[in-house]
């Protein structure tokens, strides 16, 4: 079996609809196309290295401070950037979950340790906390909702994971790339924990929802 690390490779295949990366099958929104065409006169200049206008726009949409926003070329680049910045020697990753976490960890010479989701309970996170308590790690990835199972992490378990990691100086990387599809996004996003947990990093993506 061929190992799949990321979808979207349609160029050597005949593909009508690509569901491998869960992007919008309707194509680029008209507003995005208009913005590109209407700003072509500035393409010869370097962009603002601090992405000031973009960060302020994202901050307004997400209702967080602009200084907390870091923009990148997709979630995978940001996952790599977090690992590069923290330089952990061991990271916890759920199994099963998105393979990009392990790829980023190994790219910087760190080790991946898996906390296993309960298959008998629909791959829930019920046992995650007890497993994390016994791990010697510097970073923990959580995916909410999890990819590929689609499960949301229950509120009590999510807070428990954040508490465990804060008490042990473990950076929590919360991948919320698919969370906006939930109508309760603003209520259940980890954004509400940013003031209480300075070890929390949230990853989000433009392509999935827009």
Label for each model-derived stretch:
Residues 27-32, 100, 199-210:
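PLP-dependent aminotransferase class I/II
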Residues 85-142:
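PLP-dependent aminotransferase-like
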Residues 1-45, 170:
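N-terminal "arm"/small-domain region of PLP-dependent enzymes with the aminotransferase-like
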Residues 123-136, 148-168, 172, 176-209:
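Active-site pre-lysine segment of PLP-dependent enzymes
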Residues 51-91:
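Phosphate-binding glycine-rich loop
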Residues 65, 108-109, 196-197:
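Short, structured coil segments at secondary-structure junctions
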Residues 22-24, 75, 98, 144-148, ...:
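Short glycine-rich anion-binding loops that position phosphate/pyrophosphate groups of nucleotides
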């Amino acid at each position: 079996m061929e190992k799949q690390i990321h979808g979207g490779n349609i160029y050597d295949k005949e593909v009508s609809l690509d569901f491998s990366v869960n992007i919008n099958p309707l194509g680029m929104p008209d507003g995005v196309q208009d913005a590109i065409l209407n700003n072509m006169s500035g393409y010869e200049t370097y962009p603002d290295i601090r992405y000031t206008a973009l960060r302020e726009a994202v901050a307004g949409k997400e209702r967080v401070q602009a200084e907390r926003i870091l923009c990148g070329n997709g979630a995978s680049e940001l996952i790599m950037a977090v690992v590069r910045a923290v330089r952990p020697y061991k990271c916890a990753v759920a199994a099963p979950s998105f393979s990009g976490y392990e790829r980023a960890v190994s790219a910087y010479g760190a080790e991946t340790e898996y906390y296993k989701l309960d298959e008998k309970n629909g791959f829930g996170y019920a046992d995650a906390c007890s497993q994390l308590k016994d791990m010697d790690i510097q970073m923990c990835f959580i995916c909410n909702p999890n990819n590929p199972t689609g499960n949301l992490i229950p509120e009590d378990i999510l807070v428990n994971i954040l508490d465990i990691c804060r008490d042990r100086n473990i950076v929590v990387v919360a991948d919320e790339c698919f969370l906006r599809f939930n109508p309760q996004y603003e209520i259940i996003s980890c954004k509400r924990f940013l003031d209480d947990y300075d070890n929390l990093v949230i990853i989000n993506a433009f392509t999935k929802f827009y």
